[in-house]
Design a protein with these regions (language model features):
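Glycine-centered hinge/linker elements that transmit conformational signals in sensory
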Residues: 195-243
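Extracytoplasmic/periplasmic substrate-recognition and gating elements
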Residues: 274-332
Length: 390
């Protein structure tokens, strides 16, 4: 027995040394490999592409390489081979990349609401497609349009005696046109209907192929929303030329007090003159049935960890800290996602609250969800919608 032990013990010691040496070599090699972090920014504005990297980890031992990729066609296979992390508007691109992404440690997600936590694709800033209601008309009509979808339409009807176009948005903007129709689908049918619409738009190439397909068990279909919008000009609820209107048209009508409610997103809201926005109160889209799950249509700048680079995780962890979130909100005027970060203003703070309290969390608008890499198809569908509404 002792003889066997004398033979086995040195062998075990050698094996242990080999294992330890292997671990050390592996660790050293990984540290060398992780020293360089390759980061992609896809489809983000110049402001965002400047603000986000300014908050990265300041460590001379880490080399960060950036690539700024424009909207449009993108080879996801190349992205997964070339980069360690990517920042993009949440949508078709991030959802596809997240299927093979590195899992984000739970510790990193602790600073954000449960409704926003995603182990593979985490938001760092929020936008929001909103309704803006004229505050003096809420008093005049004695109707709270935020209470329900019925209250919303009642408000528009009652506002006809005060303004030329109770409702307004600029339908010449393809993204805004699609977002509006998507928001109405969500308001009428909830999260399930909205997600089903996204899948139909991904599947079919033409409006006629999917507009009559049911989105929920009640038979709601995309055509129901389009038909509602089609009769609104005849009922004098919306300007007859709204599908070709632009943001300047909105400014003109709103400045002249001829709009009771307009639809836009937080980013575009920031571009409107103070004399306009000061007369309006921004809110989420009212819904028909509060008893079913709903989401907030709030485009979010998300991060996906493509590789297991340890320094990528350090960067992401820092971006979600209270101080950094406060600075990012100040620089971008978007909503922070951190619980305790200070928001740029009450509008951004409201978006964060709505996102945290919404049972279905946040979902991208139709552009990001479906057409992020296919602007040609987006233009085709948008033109078909305009034709349908004539």
């Amino acid at each position: 027995m002792k003889k066997k032990f004398k033979i086995i013990f040195p062998i075990l010691v050698c094996v242990c040394f080999i294992v330890i040496a292997f671990i050390i070599i592996f660790s050293v090699c990984k540290n060398i490999k992780d020293k360089t972090v390759k980061v992609a920014f896809y489809g983000l504005s110049q402001d965002l592409c400047q603000a986000i990297p300014q908050e990265f980890v300041d460590d001379e031992k880490i080399i960060i390489q950036y690539d700024f990729l424009a909207d449009g066609n993108l080879d996801l296979g190349t992205i997964t081979k070339k980069y360690d992390m990517i920042f993009a508007w949440n949508g078709e691109v991030t959802q596809n990349l997240s299927k093979s992404a590195e899992k984000i440690p739970a510790k990193i997600l602790e600073n954000i609401p449960i409704s926003l936590r995603d182990e593979y694709c985490v938001p760092i800033l929020l936008d929001h497609f909103e309704m803006a209601f004229k505050t003096d008309l809420i008093e005049k009509t004695q109707i709270n349009p935020q209470e329900s979808f019925q209250s919303f339409t009642d408000f528009l009807q009652e506002s006809k005696q005060y303004v030329f176009s109770p409702f307004f948005t600029y339908g010449s903007d393809e993204r805004m046109l699609l977002a509006l129709t998507g928001s109405f689908v969500e308001a009428l049918g909830g999260l399930e209907s909205y997600k089903n619409l996204i899948e139909l738009m991904k599947t079919y190439e033409n409006l006629d192929d999917f507009c009559d397909i049911g989105l929920n068990e009640n038979g709601l279909c995309y055509a129901d929303v389009l038909n509602m919008l089609k009769i609104w000009p005849k009922e004098e609820i919306i300007h007859p030329q709204w599908t070709i209107a632009n943001r300047i048209d909105l400014e003109v009508f709103a400045s002249d007090n001829q709009v009771a409610c307009f639809y836009t997103n937080l980013s575009e809201h920031r571009k409107l003159k103070y004399e306009i926005v000061s007369k309006f109160s921004a809110a989420k889209m009212p819904v028909v049935n509060e008893d079913i799950p709903h989401c907030l249509i709030a485009p979010s700048v998300n991060c996906v960890l493509i590789s297991d680079n340890s320094n990528s995780k350090k960067i992401l962890k820092k971006l979600l800290t209270e101080d950094v979130q406060t600075r990012l909100s100040d620089k971008t005027m978007l909503a922070p996602v951190s619980y305790r970060a200070e928001a740029y203003d009450s509008l951004a703070d409201d978006v964060r609250f709505l996102a945290a309290s919404c049972e279905g969390g946040v979902e991208p608008d139709l552009f990001n969800a479906v057409f992020q890499r296919d602007n040609e198809k987006m233009t085709l569908i948008a033109n078909q919608i305009r034709g349908y509404l004539r």
